[in-house]
């Protein structure tokens, strides 16, 4: 990961701590250009392999309106813009499962259309993936779109690698994924570190 954009300063600082070589932009993507990202990340004219992100979607289509034009959905437009300004070979767009349901589905179709008009193919049908089927101890469903520039091979969506911890029956002949206890059970009790009340380090 060579660059990341995160509007929340605390989350941006955590990302920078975990990925010190990554150029982190603690600001909104609005007004940030692909050129600025390339400059700060030291990319020059090198190919950007993939842009991955998820943007809040709050406004949905009304009669006679395109949802993608709704100001409340501006961050989705910004994601599309950044992908094209960086001329990324691939993109991964993540969002809530609700975008696939009812009236919201029209907005999803508009997003796909916007990418296709800009020269990207989107792997269809889109997929809703659950993190618990990919070795993550969390029951979290999210919509994913994978896209590639025309002329490049279009990746498939990943197949499950585990089944959720605690599942009563064996599915797909896959191993059980980790539980929350497996993932964090060996961490020390925070209450043993009184200094954390006043500082971020112990």
Q: Across the structure, where does each feature detected by a protein language model lie?
A:
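Conserved acidic residues
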Residues: 2, 49, 89
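Class I S-adenosyl-L-methionine
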Residues: 35-45, 55, 62-202
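A short SAM/SAH-binding and catalytic strip from SAM-dependent methyltransferases
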Residues: 49-52, 57
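SAM cofactor-binding core of SAM-dependent methyltransferases
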Residues: 1-31
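Active-site flanking residues adjacent to catalytic metal/cofactor-binding acidic residues
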Residues: 5, 27, 53, 93-94
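Short, glycine/acidic-enriched loop or turn micro-motifs at the edges of active sites
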Residues: 9, 31, 57, 97-98
């Amino acid at each position: 990961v060579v660059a990341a954009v995160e509007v929340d300063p605390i989350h941006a600082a955590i990302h920078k701590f975990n990925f010190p070589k990554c150029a982190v932009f603690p600001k909104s993507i609005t007004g940030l250009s692909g050129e600025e990202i390339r400059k700060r990340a030291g990319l020059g004219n090198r190919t950007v392999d993939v842009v991955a992100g998820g943007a809040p979607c709050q406004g949905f289509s009304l009669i006679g309106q395109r949802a993608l034009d709704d100001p409340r959905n501006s961050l989705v437009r910004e994601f599309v813009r950044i992908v094209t300004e960086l001329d990324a070979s691939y993109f991964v767009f993540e969002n809530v499962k609700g975008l696939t349901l009812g009236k919201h589905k029209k907005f999803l179709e508009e997003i796909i259309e916007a990418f296709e008009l800009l020269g990207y193919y989107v792997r269809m049908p889109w997929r809703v993936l659950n993190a618990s089927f990919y070795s993550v101890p969390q029951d979290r469903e999210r919509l994913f779109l994978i896209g590639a520039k025309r002329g490049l091979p279009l990746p498939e969506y990943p197949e499950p690698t585990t089944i959720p911890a605690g599942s009563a029956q064996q599915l797909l002949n896959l191993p059980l994924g980790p539980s929350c206890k497996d993932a964090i059970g060996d961490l020390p009790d925070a209450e043993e570190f009184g200094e954390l009340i006043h500082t971020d380090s112990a």
